[in-house]
UniProtKB/Swiss-Prot annotation:
Sequence similarity: Belongs to the terpene synthase family.
Pathway(s) served: Secondary metabolite biosynthesis; terpenoid biosynthesis
The protein's name in its UniProt record: Bicyclogermacrene synthase
Organism: Phyla dulcis
InterPro entries reported in the protein's UniProt record: Isoprenoid_synthase_dom_sf, Terpene_cyclase-like_1_C, Terpene_cyclase_plant_C1, Terpene_synth_N, Terpene_synth_N_sf, Terpene_synthase-like, Terpene_synthase_metal-bd, Terpenoid_cyclase/PrenylTrfase
Lineage start: Eukaryota, Viridiplantae, Streptophyta, Embryophyta, Tracheophyta
Length: 565
């Protein structure tokens, strides 16, 4: 029996009328892409051929880059600029070992190099690259840029690049670095004031840093796509690096298109638009989201698992928020706890498709885990979805009772219902040998590093989505809790919560500094989820409302190749 063809919300809507049921529908707009990403066999063959054509050229260019890194090893400034270019251009994943060695060498020489060096650009770039890599370098190197009154000495307009690099560096600050807190604001104001007088490519860089995302908080693929044409405009650019960046970007795009086509075919089988029309039909946006978590070829299996599970989490979230009655949600939660196909007959018709699909996807995950020799991970994945659903139901109980919790009470539950603890667990499942059992237990214990990511993700989501959500029967957000508890205005509440987000980024930065309990590939999954939120939610909920800017981002990564000529 094909449940996707036989079960539909439409079938139950007539029953709702006769039973006088009112549902909290959100009226999400439909999928904006249609079947655009569904490739036929000839398209897939062509993508594979295009990727193979690039591989040989890429390998030759990679050897050349290794030589260049070796040649630059004794020249501090040349080496940090080369590492910076490689990272910004988006192909650093090919050179992780070489970059680790280079930055270890730079760290050993950093203090001596910066001690009497009054070049703001050089000091800032060195600080940022080392902090990004987890090195505990001191911000005291910037004391020499203060006047006798302790104020940051702003340079003349000829040194804008130095201030821009310093502004980027301040995004790596941690708690207690008051110097960087103050000068983060000052450097931003300075860049805003000089931007109208700048010309490209510097104007493009400054505008991007101010109005898009800092290097620390942006998505690697988008940042690379933006930086390539900027880098090319500088006379000092390295043609070797630029060509490798373009070829590698296009090769990855071909791989990602193949993956998205396969996932789109799976999603089409569920037929959300027909069978679950109350839910967000967002497989393309989900895939974009997961590219922000990991884009590298080695994580292809992990990526497919995470896209499928996150898509199902989205449907379950919408079922709890925008369709299910309290009684239906209770039955669904109990069925997930039992985790058995025998529960199918107890569920409302429209929920049967969701439940059956969850079990099928988890059967696939179990097969993959057995193949990888990591079958113990499946239990963590199952508990992740059970735990999330339990917390969704607790939220539904609050909504049913029209209960307004305190801000702290709300945050304790909201950090769980945002789903990111569960998603981080799922993101680890297919990552291979780098993940040990202890890593799952670490995430579940919600250490400060993980909690910081959850807090950022929850607050940013609440800030941009609270007004739309409160138009229907929806549980209160952080904004409403803060307004009621502090007896303040909505605007003041949003300002305060944004300040908390900025402060919590310091906790994330601190958690990345060495020594760390777990290897950086695991830490990056946690960090990258917050980066995605910064990109997709800071200006609005672009997952729910897929407007022109979000569509443009998707075109850049998944439709339009980079011009290599």
């Amino acid at each position: 029996m094909d449940l996707a063809k036989q079960i539909s919300v439409v079938d139950s809507s007539l029953q709702d009328v006769t039973r006088n049921i009112t549902r909290p529908l959100a009226n999400f707009h439909p999928n904006v892409w249609g079947d655009r990403f569904l490739l036929n066999n000839s398209d897939q063959v062509q993508l594979k051929m295009n990727a193979l054509d690039k591989e040989e050229a890429i390998e030759k260019l990679k050897e050349g880059v290794r030589r260049k890194l070796k040649e630059a090893s004794n020249d501090y400034m040349r080496l940090i600029q080369m590492v910076d270019a490689i990272q910004r251009l988006g192909f650093a994943y090919h050179f992780e070992e070489e970059i680790d060695q280079a930055l270890q060498c730079l760290f050993e020489r950093h203090h001596e190099y910066c001690k009497d060096n009054h070049d703001l650009y050089a000091n800032s770039l060195s600080f940022r690259l080392l902090r990004q890599q987890g090195y505990r370098v001191s911000c005291e190197i910037f004391e020499k840029f203060k006047d006798v009154k302790g104020n940051f000495m702003l340079p003349n307009n000829g040194e804008v690049m130095g201030v821009l690099e310093f502004y980027e560096a301040t995004h790596l600050r941690v708690h207690g670095e008051d110097l960087l807190d103050h000068d983060f604001v000052l450097s931003r104001e300075y860049l805003e004031s000089v931007l109208p007088s700048l010309t490209n490519p510097l104007a493009e860089q400054v505008d991007h840093a101010l109005h898009q995302h800092s290097n620390r908080r942006g998505l690697s693929r988008l940042e690379a796509r933006h930086y390539m044409p900027v880098y090319e405009q500088y006379a000092s650019h390295d043609q070797y690096l630029l060509k490798l960046a373009k070829l590698d970007f296009n090769m990855l795009q071909s791989l990602h298109k193949e993956e998205l086509s396969e996932l789109s075919r799976w999603w089409k089988g569920i037929d959300v638009a027909r069978n679950l029309p109350y839910a967000r039909d967002r497989i393309v946006e989900t895939y974009f989201w997961i590219l922000g978590v990991y884009f590298e070829p080695e994580y292809a299996a992990a990526r497919k698992i995470l896209v499928k599970v996150q898509s199902l989490f989205s449907i379950i979230d919408d079922t709890f928020d925008a369709y299910g009655t309290f009684e239906e949600l209770q039955i669904f939660t109990q069925a997930l706890e039992r985790w058995s196909i025998s529960c199918l007959d107890q569920l409302p018709d429209y929920m049967k498709l969701i439940y059956k699909t969850v079990l099928e996807v988890y059967d696939e995950i179990e097969e993959e885990m057995i193949k990888q020799g990591t079958s113990y991970r499946t239990a963590y994945g199952i508990e992740a979805i059970k735990s999330l659903t339990r917390n969704y139901f607790m939220e539904a109980e609050w909504r049913e009772k029209k209960y307004t919790p305190t801000t702290d009470e709300h945050m304790r539950l909201a950090l769980k219902t945002c789903g990111y603890t569960s998603l981080i667990i799922i993101s680890f499942l297919g990552m291979g040998e780098v993940v040990k059992r202890e890593a799952f237990d670490w995430v579940l214990s919600e250490p400060d590093f993980v909690k910081a990511s959850l807090t950022i993700n929850r607050l940013v989501d609440d800030i941009v989505g609270h007004e739309d959500e409160q138009k229907r029967n929806h549980v209160v957000s952080s904004v409403e809790c803060y307004v009621q508890e502090s007896k303040t205005s909505r605007e003041d509440a949003v300002y305060e919560l944004n300040s908390r987000v900025e402060s919590t980024w310091k906790d994330l930065n601190e958690g990345f500094l060495k020594p760390t309990k777990f290897p950086s590939p695991l830490l990056y999954r946690v960090l990258n989820y917050s980066r995605v939120i910064e990109v997709m939610y800071t200006k609005g909920d672009w997952y729910t409302n897929v407007g022109p800017e979000m569509q443009d981002y998707i075109r850049q990564l998944l439709i339009d190749p980079v011009n290599v000529e």
